Swiss-Prot record:
Gene3D superfamilies: Electron Transport, Fmn-binding Protein, Chain A. NCBIfam families: PRK03467.1. Signal peptide: none annotated. It comes from Escherichia coli O1:K1 / APEC. This is UPF0306 protein YhbP.
Amino acid sequence: METLTAISRWLAKQHVVTWCVQQEGELWCANAFYLFDAQKVAFYILTEEKTRHAQMSGPQAAIAGTVNGQPKTVALIRGVQFKGEIRRLEGEESDLARKAYNRRFPVARMLSAPVWEIRLDEIKFTDNTLGFGKKMIWLRNSGTEQA
């Protein structure tokens, strides 16, 4: 659990996720502000259904993505690469996620975009502050953690 704890701690301090979706051989990427749920190991985002990435995702889709800072030196690079699944939330699940999202980003109260969950199934965290090229791996289904 130390690996997931370190990853979760870092993700909780960031706020923008990039993810890519594929449909019929076409790729598209998008960015959004996110709320990270450490217990579910998931991001919550808002995005309109009319967007290209939402249209390509449909109600749920496999995705890959990144979260990274913008350091000016290589020694301070930290970032996450992940794969998982995006799905549009409905009903009570959506309402609960939206309340939490609005607490993190109060301006979102003005938006009517649906709430989506990005469930992370594999995470690779690079943290050069622990040594150049230091990587930590977390896999949801195997319970595997590698440092």
